[in-house]
C-alpha cells in the first residue's frame, strides 16, 4: 500500500512504552513513502530518541497533573490551552493527513488540535487500562485501537507494535527444545531498575543454587550494589548489567523472564515466546496487573503482586517449572502474541488518511 506524499504526525512521549511502538509504526509507514513528523516534549526521552531514528520532532510544553499541588491545578487550563494553540500552529504548518496518538501527555493537546483542524485522529492504547488522555481523546477519535482487551469496551484488539529483531527470533520449539543445564533466568527491571527485584533475586539465587544461571539487568546506578548482593549471598557467578542494549539477544538466551509487566515488556515477551514471572508495579489502577493477566490466563506466565512477593514465592515458582513446562508456556506465550501489530496499526492510519 503506497503512502507516497502522505503525511503523518505521531504524538507520543514520556516513556519507552509509548515511544517505541510509535517508532515501529513510523518506520513501517516511512518504508511505504510516508513523511513522518513527531510531536513530543523537550524534557522527556523522545527528544533524544526520535531524531536518532531520522524523524524530525516538534515540541510543546505539557506535563501531567496527577500528584501536583493546587497552584499547578489552577494553572492547568491555561497551560493546556497554550499547548493546544502551539500544537495547532505546528499542525497548520505541517498539514498532516492523519495524526496517530500513542499515549503520553502530549497526545491530549495534540489530539484536540488535530480534531479542531479537521485532521483524523487515530489512537492506540498500549495498556490493559486506558490512560486518562486516551479516555478523553477516544470521544473525538476517528479510530481507537487497544493492545489488550478491556481498555475500551468496543475497540479493536491489535496488540502492541514491537521491535522487528524480537519478532525475528526463532520459535520456542527451535530455540528451547534440547536445552540442558541450569535454567537461564533473565531478570529485567527496566531502565530505572526495579528495587524489589534487585533486593529479592540474589536471595532467590542462593536458594536455587546451581539449578539456575541469572542475567540480571539492574537499572541505572544499581549494578555495583546488586553484584555485591549476589556475592554476599554466595552467588558471585551471576551476570549483572545496568542496561541491556540488545534485548532480542537477551530473550534468545533466556529460558524464563522475571520482570515488571509494562505493556511493551509483556508484548515483547509474548512475541519472543517466553514464559514469565511478572511482578507488576504497584499503581493505584493496577495497570501492570491487567497487562500481564492475558498471559497468565493463557498459561504462559504467573503473576505475583508485590505485597505477596517473597524470596520463597519466587524460588518455589521457578523450581516448580521443569524444562518441559517452560517449553509449553513459551509456546502458549507465542500463540497469545499478535506479531503483525505494527502492520495493523499502520493500516488503520492509512485508512483514516484516505477516508
From Swiss-Prot:
Q: Which GO terms of the cellular component aspect does the record hold?
A: plasma membrane
Keywords linked to the UniProt accession = Cell cycle, Cell division, Cell inner membrane, Cell membrane, Cell shape, Cell wall biogenesis/degradation, Glycosyltransferase, Membrane, Peptidoglycan synthesis, Transferase
- Pfam families noted in UniProt: Glyco_tran_28_C, Glyco_transf_28
Q: What is its EC number?
A: 2.4.1.227
Q: Which positions does UniProt annotate for UDP-N-acetyl-alpha-D-glucosamine binding? A: 15-17, 127, 163, 191, 244, 263-268, 288
Q: Which GO terms describe its molecular function?
A: UDP-N-acetyl-D-glucosamine:N-acetylmuramoyl-L-alanyl-D-glutamyl-meso-2,6-diaminopimelyl-D-alanyl-D-alanine-diphosphoundecaprenol 4-beta-N-acetylglucosaminlytransferase activity; undecaprenyldiphospho-muramoylpentapeptide beta-N-acetylglucosaminyltransferase activity
Which InterPro entries does UniProt cross-reference here? GlcNAc_MurG, Glyco_trans_28_C, GlycoTrans_28_N
Q: Which Gene3D superfamilies match?
A: Glycogen Phosphorylase B
Q: Spell out the subcellular localization from the entry.
A: Cell inner membrane
Primary site of residence: membrane
UniProt superkingdom = Bacteria
Q: Which family does it belong to?
A: Belongs to the glycosyltransferase 28 family. MurG subfamily.
PANTHER family documented for this protein: GLYCOSYLTRANSFERASE, UDP-N-ACETYLGLUCOSAMINE--N-ACETYLMURAMYL-(PENTAPEPTIDE) PYROPHOSPHORYL-UNDECAPRENOL N-ACETYLGLUCOSAMINE TRANSFERASE 1
Protein known as: UDP-N-acetylglucosamine--N-acetylmuramyl-(pentapeptide) pyrophosphoryl-undecaprenol N-acetylglucosamine transferase
Origin species, per record, is: Escherichia coli (strain 55989 / EAEC)
Could you read off the lineage of the organism from its UniProt record? Bacteria, Pseudomonadati, Pseudomonadota, Gammaproteobacteria, Enterobacterales
